[in-house]
């Protein structure tokens, strides 16, 4: 049981901190607040301040909690992890939904709300663990590649539109040549990133092992494999639970059932990581064409009269369940696999 709950509200240049002293769900003292810079010296001052205001409570009874804000939250979380403190990084929407109606909006109020959330839900806390250095680097390369690809697509579309809509002129020629040059340079950048990704995977035993297993499935290419690895911490983030991974991808169907009038068939929820969901869709389409196990499963469902979009979502689910089981058991894909419909 924890007795000291430290809520942290992250921002670019500072963190706002609130401390709640509690015995169970009862607060035993007034809340205290402060703010610190997002630097190593600022983090050290934060720890010193908490120690001074801890009323003698042992560090093992402390629980830091904050919203997952990506890079903004990474610095302090890694610092606390390195010092041996318990840090809970929670989804921002979970905190907001559980905290009810709040009229006051400020950094200090947000830190207080987070500390209160930690106090009331500490039994559900999942302690923060950073990605391994190799996996963290792989994640950065993957995200950078996605950004470059988006820019390339933007220039390709813009150049195509101008070619179709503008009359022939020196300006049109300049735009076309410039766009072609930029797209060419971006293609070179993507090639360099892909080469670096391949080198990084080969340099790490665990990465190459998981990568080899995932890409042994026909239809799963390099980008989908890397995407799964970096977003699931090599499938450990969800403890190899394929249902949770499917939910994270936004392909797990949920129904609505209430009273006598609300009854709807299960549907996928809009809350999902849409970027990786789109990538999995491409993998599912490729698997239907090139993976005999998935192709047979797809045709069975289509012959039963199911809509093709529903069947495609089922294929995505089967791929996630299949790949997760393979990684958990450290087994390569076999064409002898049998999938029940």
Where are these predicted regions, by residue range?
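Acidic, metal-coordinating catalytic cores used for nucleic-acid/nucleotide bond scission
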Residues: 62-75
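Short, glycine/acidic-enriched loop or turn micro-motifs at the edges of active sites
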Residues: 12, 70, 94
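Nucleic-acid-processing active sites and adjacent nucleic-acid-binding tracks
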Residues: 24-63
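Long, charge-rich intrinsically disordered scaffolds of nucleic-acid metabolism proteins
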Residues: 88, 92-213
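Gly/Thr-rich phosphate-binding beta-strand-loop-beta motif of the actin/hexokinase/Hsp70
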Residues: 2-22, 114
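Phosphate-backbone recognition surface of nucleic-acid-processing proteins
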Residues: 216, 222, 226-304, 308
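Anion (oxyanion) recognition and catalysis
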Residues: 81
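Low-complexity, acidic/Ser/Thr- and charged residue-rich accessory regions of DNA metabolism proteins
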Residues: 260-261, 298-341
């Amino acid at each position: 049981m924890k007795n000291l709950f430290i809520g942290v509200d992250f921002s670019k240049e500072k963190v706002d901190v609130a401390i709640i002293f509690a015995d169970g769900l009862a607060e035993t003292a007034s809340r205290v607040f402060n703010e610190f810079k997002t630097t190593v010296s600022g983090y050290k001052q934060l720890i010193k301040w908490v120690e001074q205001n801890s009323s003698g409570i042992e560090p093992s009874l402390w629980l830091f909690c904050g919203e997952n804000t990506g890079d903004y939250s990474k610095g302090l979380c890694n610092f606390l992890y390195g010092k041996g403190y318990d840090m809970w990084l929670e989804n921002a929407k979970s905190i907001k939904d559980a905290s009810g109606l709040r009229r006051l909006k400020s950094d200090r109020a947000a830190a207080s709300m987070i500390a209160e959330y930690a106090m009331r839900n500490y039994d559900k806390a999942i302690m923060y663990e950073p990605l391994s250095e190799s996996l963290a680097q792989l994640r950065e390369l993957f995200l950078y590649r996605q950004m470059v690809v988006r820019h390339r697509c933007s220039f390709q579309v813009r150049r195509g539109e101008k070619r179709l809509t503008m009359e022939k002129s020196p300006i049109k020629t300049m735009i076309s040549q410039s766009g072609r040059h930029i797209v060419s340079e971006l293609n070179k950048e993507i090639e360099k990133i892909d080469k670096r990704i391949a080198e990084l995977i080969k340099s790490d035993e665990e990465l190459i092992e998981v990568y080899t297993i995932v890409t042994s499935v026909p239809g799963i290419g390099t980008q989908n494999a890397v995407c799964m690895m970096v977003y699931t911490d090599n499938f450990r983030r969800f403890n190899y639970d394929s249902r949770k991974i499917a939910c994270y991808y936004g392909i797990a169907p949920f129904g609505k059932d209430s009273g006598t009038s609300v009854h709807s068939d299960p549907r996928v929820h809009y809350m999902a990581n849409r970027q990786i969901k789109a990538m999995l869709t491409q993998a599912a389409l490729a698997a239907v064409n090139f993976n005999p196990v998935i192709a047979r499963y797809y045709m069975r469902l289509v012959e039963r009269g199911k809509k093709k979009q529903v069947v495609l979502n089922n294929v995505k689910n089967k791929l996630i369940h299949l790949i997760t089981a393979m990684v958990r058991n450290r087994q390569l894909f076999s064409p002898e696999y049998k999938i029940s419909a």
